[in-house]
Design a protein with these regions (language model features):
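C-terminal helical subdomain
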Residues: 137, 145-147, 151-159, 164-201
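Conserved NAD(P)H cofactor-binding loop of Rossmann-fold oxidoreductase domains
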Residues: 60-69
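N-terminal Rossmann NAD(P)H-binding glycine-rich loop of SDR-like oxidoreductase domains
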Residues: 4-19
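Substrate-binding pocket helix/loop in short-chain dehydrogenase/reductase
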Residues: 70-71, 78-80
Length: 201
């Protein structure tokens, strides 16, 4: 399969690329680096990406930014940034790409456990993650030509925690998280929220 991986230079994205590249043709997309570049907050940028990268059998999004902060400190702009980037950016990957993806292709998006297990300061991120999960469940009912859509819900990634100066053992290694993405691409699930923790070993 020819698979577009968005966020390919990020911690999870790099692990997903590594997990897929042995069996598939992987097109690496980043905000500033990679085979192609895309700005998820710009629908026109997404349209241009697909024009350049077509044809393709699957899209994996391991990208998207959202603001973390106390509820009484988050501004309208913080919420709008989160909605425009991680939520609508991934929604538009599907809306624009669903007419161009090959038959029986798949979209794999990324939410996160904060949709179901919020913490203090996660209001904007939890909102976005829950929205993505609801979108995927509903969109799966309308995907054309056998196209599937799933969302991966990863926990904190060990490498990210270590970069923050925290205990990496409290997270899950990116290589293990990547197994959930491979399952979404190569499996038959549709309209599912896949908890990456099920793929820990």
């Amino acid at each position: 399969m020819r698979i577009i991986v968005i966020g390919a230079t990020g911690t999870i994205g790099k692990a997903v690329v590594e997990a897929l590249r042995g069996k598939h043709e992987v097109v690496q997309v980043g905000h500033r680096h990679g085979d192609y570049q895309v700005d998820l907050a710009d629908k026109g940028s997404i349209e241009r990406l697909y024009e350049m990268a077509a044809p393709f059998d699957a899209v994996v999004s391991a990208a998207g930014l959202a603001k973390f902060g106390a509820l009484d400190g988050l501004s309208d702009a913080d919420f709008q940034f989160s909605l425009s980037n991680k939520l609508m950016g991934q929604v538009n990957l599907v809306r624009v790409g669903m007419t161009q993806i090959r038959d029986n292709g798949s979209f794999t998006l990324t939410s996160g456990v904060l949709s179901q297990e919020p913490t203090r300061g996660s209001a904007a991120i939890s909102l976005v993650n829950a929205g993505l999960e609801g979108f995927a469940r509903a969109a799966a009912l309308e995907m054309p030509r056998g196209v599937r859509i799933n969302v991966i819900s990863p926990p904190w990634v060990s490498e990210t925690l270590e970069a923050m100066g925290r205990d990496g053992d409290a997270g899950m290694p990116a290589a293990q998280v990547a197994r959930a993405y491979v399952e979404s691409v190569e499996g038959s699930e549709n309209g599912e929220v896949i908890d990456a923790r099920a793929y820990a070993y």
